[in-house]
């Protein structure tokens, strides 16, 4: 019997919690040891929402959604594990321990009405989220929320502890669910630490600029903030971006990063960021896919005024990013706590994540949203693929007292329209 929980007075309500486990138990004593790079992500979470039309999902029952999870969890038992600590204090994962939480809810709107809102950050209300802790042995690493719209459409929202894996891992997990739902055979290989061959590691030891050590948080894994953060999102097309901001030889992500960095720098004035972090896919793209933290984490430092520099100069500096994963992996010890997202102004390229491969009844989602929970005070920008190949969804998380000023700078330069 699930737990019934009514929360809030908005259009999403009627929360009912239950547990989903693997189809078979794992071998007794199966554990997973997180790497230093995993532990650097300990205070961050990914929140993803897949929305399917009524025509696709009207006849899907709760059991239809739950059943494929049994085999996926058996293939990836760490996802439904629970953390413990070694005597040294270093966390480790006891695999296939207690399952995950499945949340059922209802929305009073239709899918069409829900998607009519231009700011897709509203989708975060379709994700049931709880941080890991304070009781590590009882804290799930994954929550799955199934929301039924009034028209019969369906949203599946995931709250994913980033210590388990990067956005590609989350997408891989959900694509496996879709394959199992369609009756296909699934297989997820295990990835050993020795298989992590990071490209262009830093040749000499230097404290990485892309991470920031924070005060110890104990067993409640929540990133500390001095500022109240807020989020908004907007859509654009690659063609419009390159037409209005022509920069020779550079991709849309670099151009977007340069524009938004310049806007934030203008707003922050004397405290304008001269160091940023860029997180994107590993150029080597480990295959076959596995659940891991393999995303490339780089820092860029400039010695000029970003607010006054040309877009070409800023974009050129982004091409000189230094991959810091090896050093991050080395410096993160057993007990210290760090943040990555928002340690500096952080730009995350998820445009290559294959979110729209998660087909139900042969149909791709109507919309997919993904963002990071636990962003530090310097803020973060996430670039997502749109439902149309040439479209991008840009999600911006900044301190409350900056967000409207940054929006205004984006309007002035022509990145967003006055309607946003």
Swiss-Prot record:
UniProt keyword annotation of Plastid present: no
Keywords recorded for this protein, A-Z: Cell wall biogenesis/degradation
Statement: the UniProt record of this protein carries the keyword Cell wall biogenesis/degradation: yes
Single GO cellular component term: chloroplast thylakoid membrane
Source organism, top-level taxon: Eukaryota
Expressed in which tissues: Highly expressed in flowers. Expressed in leaves.
Family matches, as InterPro entries: CAT-like_dom_sf, Plant_Fungal_Acyltransferase
GO biological process, one term: cell wall organization
Protein family: Belongs to the plant acyltransferase family.
Function text: Involved in biosynthesis of the epicuticular wax. Plays a role in very-long-chain fatty acid (VLCFA) biosynthesis and is required for VLCFA elongation in leaf. Despite its classification as a BAHD acyltransferase based on sequence homology, CER26L does not seem to share the catalytic mechanism of the members of the BAHD family.
Official protein name in the record: Protein ECERIFERUM 26-like
Taxonomic source organism: Arabidopsis thaliana
Classification lineage: Eukaryota, Viridiplantae, Streptophyta, Embryophyta, Tracheophyta
Gene name for this UniProt entry: CER26L
């Amino acid at each position: 019997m699930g737990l019934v929980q009514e929360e809030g007075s908005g259009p999403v309500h009627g929360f009912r919690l239950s547990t989903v486990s693997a189809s078979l138990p794992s071998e007794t004593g199966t554990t997973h040891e997180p790497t230093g790079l995993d532990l650097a992500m300990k205070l961050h979470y990914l929140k993803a929402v897949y929305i399917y039309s009524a025509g696709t999902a009207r006849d899907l029952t709760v059991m239809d959604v739950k059943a494929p999870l049994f085999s996926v969890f058996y293939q990836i038992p760490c996802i439904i594990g629970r953390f413990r600590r070694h005597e040294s204090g270093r966390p480790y994962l006891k695999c296939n321990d207690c399952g995950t939480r499945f949340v059922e809810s209802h929305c009073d709107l239709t899918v069409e009405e829900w998607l009519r809102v231009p700011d897709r950050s509203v989708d975060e209300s379709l994700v049931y989220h709880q941080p890991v802790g304070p009781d590590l042995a009882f804290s799930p690493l994954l929550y799955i929320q199934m929301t039924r719209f009034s028209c019969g459409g369906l949203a599946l929202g995931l709250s994913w502890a980033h210590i388990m894996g990067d956005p590609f891992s989350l997408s891989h997990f959900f694509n496996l669910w879709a394959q199992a739902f369609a009756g296909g055979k699934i297989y997820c290989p295990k990835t050993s630490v020795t298989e992590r061959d990071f490209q262009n590691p830093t040749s000499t030891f230097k404290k990485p600029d892309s991470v920031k050590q924070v005060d110890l948080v104990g067993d409640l894994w929540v990133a500390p903030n001095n500022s109240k953060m807020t989020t908004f999102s907007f859509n654009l097309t690659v063609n419009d971006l390159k037409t209005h901001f022509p920069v020779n030889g550079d991709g849309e992500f670099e151009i977007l990063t340069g524009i938004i960095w310049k806007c934030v720098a203008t707003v922050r004035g004397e405290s304008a960021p001269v160091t940023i972090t860029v997180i994107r896919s590993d150029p080597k793209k480990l295959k076959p896919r596995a659940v891991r933290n393999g995303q490339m984490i780089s820092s860029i430092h400039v010695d000029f005024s970003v607010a006054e520099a040309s877009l070409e100069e800023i974009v050129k500096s982004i091409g000189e990013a230094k991959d810091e994963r090896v050093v991050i992996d080395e410096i993160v010890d057993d007990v210290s706590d760090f943040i990555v997202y928002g340690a500096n102004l952080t730009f995350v390229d998820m445009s290559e994540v294959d979110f729209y491969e998660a087909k139900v009844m042969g149909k791709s989602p109507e919309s997919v949203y993904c963002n990071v929970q636990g962003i530090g005070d310097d803020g973060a920008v996430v670039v997502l693929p749109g439902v149309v190949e040439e479209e991008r969804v840009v999600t911006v998380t900044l301190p409350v007292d900056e967000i409207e000023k940054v929006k205004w700078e984006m309007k002035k330069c022509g990145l967003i329209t006055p309607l946003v």
